[in-house]
A protein has these predicted regions:
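Catalytic core of bacterial c-di-GMP phosphodiesterases, primarily the EAL and HD-GYP domains
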Residues: 2-6, 94-168, 244
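A structural signal for short, well-ordered beta-strand segments
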Residues: 51, 67-69, 122
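Short beta-strand edge/capping elements of PAS-family sensory modules
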Residues: 63-66, 80, 151
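PAS/PAS-like sensory domains
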Residues: 44-50, 117-118
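EAL-family c-di-GMP phosphodiesterase catalytic domain
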Residues: 1-32, 39-42, 52, 57-61, ...
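Short histidine-centered catalytic/ligand-binding loop motif
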Residues: 85-94
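PAS and related sensory helical modules
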Residues: 77-86
Length: 291
């Protein structure tokens, strides 16, 4: 059932109420219209998770999948504008949309567990962590099912680590680790990366940003940097994943420098959950081949 907008407590988000803000420009009008459509889409169940596989290439093993938000309408991905995902990141952290998406994460974890025991990666952007200051606990953000924590990886970006609520973030991450979650530093290399991250935060995985992965076959300096990064991660007990692997040459170059866990279009794009579960069955039968 679609909830009425009157149920939204934050008046700045109640576009039909008497206190609604009146846009002062065409760009603001477009944003307001997009926000309304996104809210309706969340409540109608059109905003859902797709899954992109993550493989250990030498072992030919499906080890994880990243949950990526998509707007699905009439069985197809809907792309209303280039910036809709940025708006969605803001909207999905507001009540009641926050609770709706939290339920989707819980259901997704339970559904995949019926087919296989692989890790699921969930990206929590900086907006989520405003809930830490409001007293929200780990179970309210991620779920109460113990298997969620044991087989889930929370992805945070370097940008998130730069937020002001560092104390609350550290407490949250410690609680997640104690509950069984792993922590991944996403888009590594896209912001101001530094070694202090490894000392201040108990990171289990770093995921190389596509911008680094793409340079590997073109720049010898990039290859040297990533080779030594892989060695350092090995010494620290931190796993290293490569995102944005789109061609065989890149995959081969990564393997040569010791980076064996790959995610990208070469090995599989993000697909609906129902399709992914069918692929799991095919993979277990040897029908889903890794390039």
């Amino acid at each position: 059932m679609i909830l009425p907008y009157d149920s939204i407590e934050n008046e700045s988000w109640n576009f039909r109420g008497p206190k609604a803000k009146v846009p002062t420009s065409k760009s603001q009008t477009k944003i307001s219209h997009l926000d309304v459509r996104l809210k309706e889409a969340i409540q109608a169940g059109e905003i859902c998770y797709y899954l992109q596989p993550i493989f250990d290439i030498p072992r030919q093993q499906l080890i994880a999948a990243e949950a990526l938000i998509r707007w699905q309408r009439d069985g197809e991905i809907h792309l209303p504008s280039n910036g809709y995902l940025d708006r969605l990141k803001l909207i999905e952290t507001r009540s009641p949309f926050f609770e709706i998406m939290a339920d989707k994460r819980k259901s997704l974890r339970s559904m995949i567990s019926l087919h296989c025991d692989i890790d699921l990666h969930f990206n929590l952007n900086s907006e989520f962590f405003q809930y830490l200051e409001k007293g929200y606990g780990l179970s309210q953000i991620c779920g109460e099912n113990p298997c969620f924590f044991d087989l889930s990886i929370i992805e945070i970006t370097e940008e998130t680590l730069s937020q002001k609520n560092e104390k609350e973030l550290v407490t949250f991450l410690q609680g997640a680790k104690e509950a069984g979650c792993k922590i991944a530093l996403d888009d590594f290399g896209s912001e101001h990366s530094n070694l202090k991250r490894f000392m201040d935060y108990d990171i289990d995985i770093i995921k190389l940003d596509k911008s680094l992965t793409c340079q590997l076959i073109q720049k010898s300096k990039a290859r040297a940097v990533l080779r030594n990064l892989a060695l350092m991660c090995g010494d620290l007990g931190v796993q290293i994943y490569a995102e944005g692997v789109e061609c065989q040459d890149t995959s081969d170059a990564l393997l040569e420098i010791g980076i064996s866990i790959h995610q990208g279009f070469l090995h599989g794009k993000a697909i609906p959950v129902a399709d992914f579960t069918r692929k799991i069955d095919e993979f277990q039968k040897g029908l889903w081949m890794i390039h």
